[in-house]
Design a protein with these regions (language model features):
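N-terminal, active-site-proximal structural segment of metallo-dependent hydrolase catalytic domains
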Residues: 33, 58-59, 65-66, 120-232, ...
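Hydrophobic h-region of N-terminal signal peptides that target proteins for export
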Residues: 9-18
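Metal-dependent phosphoester-hydrolase catalytic domains
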Residues: 20-36, 96-99, 104-108, 116, ...
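Extended non-catalytic accessory segments flanking core domains
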Residues: 18-145, 150-162, 176-178
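Sec-dependent signal peptide recognition
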Residues: 2-8
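Active-site-proximal beta-strand elements of phosphoester/diester hydrolases
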Residues: 145-160, 246-248, 281-291
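Structured beta-strand-rich core segments of catalytic domains in phosphoester-bond hydrolases
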Residues: 202-289
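Extracytoplasmic, non-cytosolic globular domains
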Residues: 55-62, 173, 192, 264-273, ...
Length: 429
């Protein structure tokens, strides 16, 4: 019996010693040497993406190349390709047994054991231990400031079925509404500029009913359109803080245009608790530009976004004249990263990027493990002097979910949409 114990101990020692401890740098130097071997990866890594049974890991978070460099659609650059190659070379994919809904991008991984199955790929029959220390902190609003929130709420529809990303069951639709309402309430906004809301009255009224349960009194403004089975935008405002004046102004004269209800401006007047005007006014332009297609380049959709920006820039002087105020905020989902030409065109037209002013290294969206800003906040020169704080609030993009469906047990506000909201505090004077 003792002899058997000795043999078992020897075999166990051999199996343990067969698992080589290596750094990511050692693996990168010669992947072929470690292929089909069990290894213990010692390099601290961060979760950049979560895809069903796979995690994308890297030494640090990965930026979308167009967030930091001129991309393919704008003429290409050496820096763009350097980032593309760096993101690929410094990231690995591990197939594991983690519960996808428990892993967030930004989680830390401090070593794991797995089999190398090829360059940058690992497989393990166990889970990968992750830790999360970040807090989605939202700065408190400065006394006397007006809080304006720009948010893509990802296809908020009152009706079921039909639209490609609409929730298909009453329970899913109710959970979606509950999450959006919780998220908006938590931000304590005085004015919300919302993208991807079903046009017409149904969806805004549905959201107002949920918001007004808390004792606040909200109302809404949207562009009147005939086709009610599509997405647009709307403003939701606290009636004891701001009130709209004059009619909304679209960047598109054609009411049948897909962008008529997606790109428009509205003037707002500040009021006291009794609803009396305080004399301060400002203008908010809500914009949702043409979406990207998967893959690099996107030249055809890029041209459409440039056209969207041309229409926007032509509309803004009209908005200033209509509302009689040059204090203008531009919010919404621009579907462009920071270094892309549509964004730079807006900046060059005299509307500085407030995210680059307050938090240039942050993000509002994650796609295939790469992060960047698709959601924006620009300000006219007179408004920029009155912007006191801007931040993305990280309650959505880091959380995984299956497209079009939530876990019904998840009653939190997290992942109410796929984009982070942009929170803006202004002190008008």
């Amino acid at each position: 019996m003792r002899k058997h114990y000795v043999i078992l101990i020897a075999l166990y020692t051999l199996s343990v010693s067969a698992v080589e401890r290596v750094s990511l740098e050692q693996l990168q130097a010669d992947w072929s040497r470690y292929t089909n071997q069990m290894v213990q990866v010692s390099t601290p890594l961060v979760v950049c993406g979560s895809f069903y049974d796979s995690l994308l890991l890297a030494p640090e978070r990965l930026y979308c190349p167009e967030e930091r460099a001129v991309g393919l659609a704008d003429g290409d650059s050496t820096e763009y390709w350097r980032i593309v190659e760096s993101n690929r070379a410094n990231s690995i994919v591990i197939h594991c047994r983690n519960s996808y809904y428990k892993v967030r991008t930004g989680d830390r991984v401090r070593g794991f054991q797995a089999r190398v199955t090829g360059e940058r790929h690992f497989v393990t029959g166990a889970g990968v231990k992750t830790s999360h220390t970040r807090v989605a902190k939202l700065e408190r609003k400065e006394k006397g400031a007006v809080r304006v929130v720009g948010a893509n709420v990802e296809n908020l529809f009152a009706d079921l079925g039909g639209y490609a990303t609409r929730r298909t069951t009453p329970k899913q639709n109710a959970l979606k509404l509950s999450k959006v309402a919780k998220g908006l309430k938590a931000m304590k906004g005085d004015l919300y500029a919302l993208c991807e809301v079903q046009v017409g009255d149904k969806a805004p009224m549905m959201l107002l009913e949920a918001l007004n349960k808390g004792g606040k009194k909200y109302a809404y403004v949207s562009m009147p359109v005939e086709n009610m089975d599509r997405i647009g935008g709307c403003f939701i405002y606290r009636v004891d803080r701001v009130r709209p004046y004059e009619a909304p102004l679209s960047a598109y004269a054609d009411t049948s245009s897909h962008y008529y209800a997606r790109m428009f401006a509205q003037g707002f007047a500040c009021v006291d608790k009794k609803g009396a005007p305080t004399g301060e006014r400002f203008v908010v332009s809500l914009n949702h530009l043409k979406s990207k297609r998967p893959g690099r380049g996107n030249y055809d959709t890029h041209l459409k976004r440039l056209s969207n920006v041309d229409s926007l820039l032509a509309m803004l002087p009209k908005a200033v004249a209509l509302y009689g105020d040059s204090d203008v905020l531009l919010l919404g989902d621009y579907n462009c990263y920071t270094q892309e030409l549509p964004i730079q065109a807006i900046v060059r037209a005299g509307y500085p990027d407030q995210l680059m002013r307050f938090c240039p290294n942050d993000y509002s969206y994650i796609f295939k493990g790469e992060m960047g800003y698709l959601d924006r906040c620009f300000a006219s020169p007179s408004m920029e002097a009155q912007v006191v704080h801007v931040q993305p609030w990280h309650v959505n993009a880091d959380w995984y979910y299956q497209h079009g469906a939530y876990r019904l047990k998840d009653k939190s506000l997290h992942r109410y949409a796929d984009h982070e909201p942009i929170v803006v505090d202004i002190k008008l004077r």
